[in-house]
Structures are given as structure tokens and as C-alpha cells.
Regions:
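Metallocofactor- and cofactor-centric catalytic cores in central/energy metabolism, strongly enriched
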Residues: 1-262
């Protein structure tokens, strides 16, 4: 998974000293129906905005706390990225927006009936928010209300930078308070342990590459399937923290083939 070794000594010192915001108590919304009947939304911290929307403002002290709504009809390749952090590699995201906003993968999963439906609207944040007060008090509740209005059942939240790990966790907590089951991909296990999102899957990739590699639909789908495994098979109590690694999720059981008797 991601590691602080990716970063300069100065950034490592900052991350060590930073007062991570612990979620307490940890809210929990159980998954009460099969994913094949669920409406699923995405939340990205990559600072993505659609054509005609204002970009995120990289001059806001502590990070731009606003959010953007990305419609399900969005062409992923046309999204603009305005993430202020310079500590992670943006090149993969420039090549394939699905690395942080896998809307194309979600459409494919809906087409095969793995999920019930793609939500009509999705959430975009600029996740490098070192002062998350407004995010917690204003932005996350407003964003959650938008998904509730769309009758969203499940949200998958995706970070790209070190502080993004905290941002998606804080948003997930508010979504859970408002009755939406969530799972966060996490790039730093130590942040997941300190902040405590309701459900987290630590992924073995560096920052900027939360779903693996660009232009790798099969690999990106495997990551989403692992996130869905956490939702479907980890009943709590919260917080649930798992790692995507060899043996987890376990391979599917082979189908039983009935051989007719002679």
C-alpha cells in the first residue's frame, strides 16, 4: 500500500505531527440488501470538476472545502483535475481519470447486474484539506443530503493524497450517519487507524494510483470488487479495517457441478 516513504523528509515530518481527526463514535449503516439491488455512488478526492463548473480553488488556506456534483452522464476523460497537492504523482490520473473516479467501471458493473444501478450523481472533493472544520460541519452534510435525495444505498470513497485519506473518511462518516453504507479505499494504513472510517480497505498502491494502474479496466474492477467484498462480508462492529493482499478477499468458491447419474 502507500507509504510515507514516498515523500520527502519534510512531508514525512508534517504527516507525523499532523493532528489527525479521529471519528468518534464511528457511525455504521449496515448493508441491508444485495448489491445487485443497490444504487451505488462514487466520491473522489481528486479535485475533479465537469465542464462548466468552477475549478477547485488552490489558494484557500487549509484547502477548498467545497464539493462538486458529477452527473452519471459525465464523460470521465473530459473531467478537469485541480488538486492542489504536489506530493503525489498526477501523471496516472491525467492519463486515466478512472484511477480516482471509476465511473466507467461502475457502469460496466451495472451492465452485468453486479450492482443495481449507477447513482445519478456523484461527489468530488479536493481532498488536501488540512483544516477540515467546514468539511465536517457544512460540506459533508450537504453532500450526503444530495445522495440521500437520489436514494443512494452505497458509496465508495477514493483518496489520492496523504490528507485525502482523512477527507474521504470524514465524508464517509457523515454518509453513514445519514443512512448510506460506505467503504473507503485507503492508501495509508496508519491514517486509517487514527481517523477510523466506518469501513476501510487499504490498497497496495502509491498515492495518485488508488485503483492500481491507468488503462487497466480489469485491475480497477478487481479493486472495486474487493471493496464490495468488505461491504458484503464484514458485518462490523465499526470500524472495519482490511487490507487488499494475497488471500484477501478470498478467491470465490468454485461452482458446484452436478453430474447426472448414468
Amino acid at each position: 500500500m502507500g507509504s510515507t516513504r514516498e515523500f520527502s523528509f519534510g512531508i514525512r515530518l508534517f504527516l507525523k505531527a499532523y493532528p489527525w481527526r479521529k471519528i468518534h463514535p464511528v457511525p455504521w449503516t449496515p448493508l441491508t440488501k444485495p448489491l445487485a439491488e443497490c444504487t451505488v455512488a462514487l466520491g473522489t478526492s481528486a479535485g475533479l470538476s465537469a465542464s462548466g463548473q468552477p475549478p477547485f480553488d488552490d489558494h484557500v488556506r487549509g484547502g477548498d472545502p467545497t464539493f462538486r456534483i458529477l452527473p452519471a452522464s459525465t464523460e470521465v476523460a473530459t473531467l478537469q483535475e485541480n488538486h492542489r497537492s504536489t506530493v503525489f504523482d498526477h501523471s496516472g490520473l491525467h492519463r486515466d481519470r478512472n484511477l480516482a473516479f471509476p465511473l466507467d467501471r461502475l457502469r460496466e458493473l451495472a451492465a452485468t447486474r453486479r450492482i443495481g444501478a449507477v447513482a445519478p450523481q456523484h461527489l468530488s472533493f479536493m481532498g488536501s484539506q488540512t483544516a477540515p472544520g467546514r468539511l465536517v460541519k457544512e460540506t459533508a452534510p450537504a453532500a450526503a443530503a444530495r445522495l440521500r435525495a437520489d436514494k443512494v444505498d452505497v458509496a465508495v470513497l477514493i483518496p489520492v493524497c496523504p490528507v485525502c485519506n482523512q477527507t474521504v473518511a470524514l465524508v464517509a462518516a457523515e454518509l453513514e450517519r445519514q443512512g448510506i453504507a460506505t467503504v473507503c479505499l485507503m492508501l495509508l494504513r496508519e491514517v486509517a487507524e487514527r481517523v477510523r472510517p466506518p469501513r476501510a480497505l487499504c490498497v497496495p498502491f502509491r498515492h495518485g494510483y488508488p485503483l492500481g494502474q491507468p488503462d487497466d479496466p480489469a485491475g480497477q474492477t478487481r479493486v472495486l470488487e474487493a471493496a464490495f467484498y468488505v461491504l458484503e462480508n464484514e458485518p462490523g462492529p465499526a470500524p472495519v479495517l482490511r487490507e487488499l493482499r494475497s488471500g484477501y478477499p478470498p478467491p470465490p468458491e468454485p461452482a458446484t457441478i452436478e453430474v447426472p447419474e448414468d
